[in-house]
């Protein structure tokens, strides 16, 4: 019998104390193999339960997502009325297809609103492929640098094994987007689109790059172990490897048409059917037309494992050598919600990261944690957000854009949000989703706002230079890359 709630704390403390001192034989007594005789007993018990019989009949004939969908709840939550929205329509609906570029789409979709407004355009996209190309190139080089800096660790160490797992995966973080734009700028998609196959279906390309990078990792670690290998040898090896990675990339993608400081010419037609010509560079286009000041955006997260009001840094996570580290400010959900409202009121969309597709109905475009009636089959989910993070049940997997919300007049908090995804117009309702506040609280992990939109006490966390961040290892769930 489990202890009462009154004695639970003392019980757990005593249990842990005994467990730490327990010899192996005691631990062995606690193991439990499957008792075959109990299987028949369990089966008879469940077969005599009419509720269980009904549930198993349905689930053996239908997809669980279809069978358990609460359509009454769905109809109630599928409300597309929003009283706080950005003024510019974000068109066309974008589609990352079979690639993990959601973070690049969400970030460029946020900035394209500025271009649409600035140039009086009906439709526009920034080139996601342009950033994708350089992200791959930079990530490969960043990986090689991490291999060199971790050469003192055993090949079987958790760090080295983690680095080797996915050296150039598609996913990323907003700070990694900023690192790319600072170095390479932005260009219109008209100049560099998604035509190469591997841009929109990157699995095989990633596999080949990963294989080559693991080979390079062994070469570097072997060279570093040889006492005769001085710095110049490693530098030469690195340059040879960079060249080979670039060669491989040029096989799968076109080389971007311009250098960051090289001028390009772009012709376009505005809403009034007037033809215009722009001469600009990628770096100038990012600042002049996309209106991006890379020093302004900051990331905030909700991680209930750690104290609120603290900076959190992810060790070794990045893409561009010498670029900014991945740093967040940890805040409560109410603060996140209020900042979303404030930013939307400033006519700016909100980049956010969530655990997708948890509790997301792709057919109708509704995100709600009560959308499926799992309790009807006795399947309950009692874990809280902090526990889900600790036990690898929840993490940020996808980035999207909040372009509107419906604010309650009394609480001044959102009741629901309008979400722009990057899975094409056939996902959700013409590419748009409605997300409930409860979903936001449970499965939203990150938002990006401008530092001047923060209260002074929060902004100072980033600017004072006095805040020592909590440093989490690269494999921590908060270091997950949105795809």
UniProtKB/Swiss-Prot annotation:
Q: Does the keyword Cytoplasm apply?
A: yes
Query: GO cellular-component terms in the record?
Result: cytoplasm; mitochondrion
What EC designation does it have? 3.4.22.40
This protein's UniProt keywords: Cytoplasm, DNA-binding, Hydrolase, Mitochondrion, Protease, Thiol protease, Transit peptide
Mutation effect (residue 398 to A): Abolishes Hcy-thiolactonase activity
Residues at the catalytic site: 102, 398, 421
Similarity comment: family membership: Belongs to the peptidase C1 family.
Supply any other comment.
Answer: Present with 521 molecules/cell in log phase SD medium.
Q: What does this protein do?
A: The normal physiological role of the enzyme is unknown, but it is not essential for the viability of yeast cells. Has aminopeptidase activity, shortening substrate peptides sequentially by 1 amino acid. Has bleomycin hydrolase activity, which can protect the cell from the toxic effects of bleomycin. Has homocysteine-thiolactonase activity, protecting the cell against homocysteine toxicity. Acts as a repressor in the GAL4 regulatory system, but this does not require either the peptidase or nucleic acid-binding activities.
Listed name of the protein: Cysteine proteinase 1, mitochondrial
What is this protein's gene name?
A: LAP3
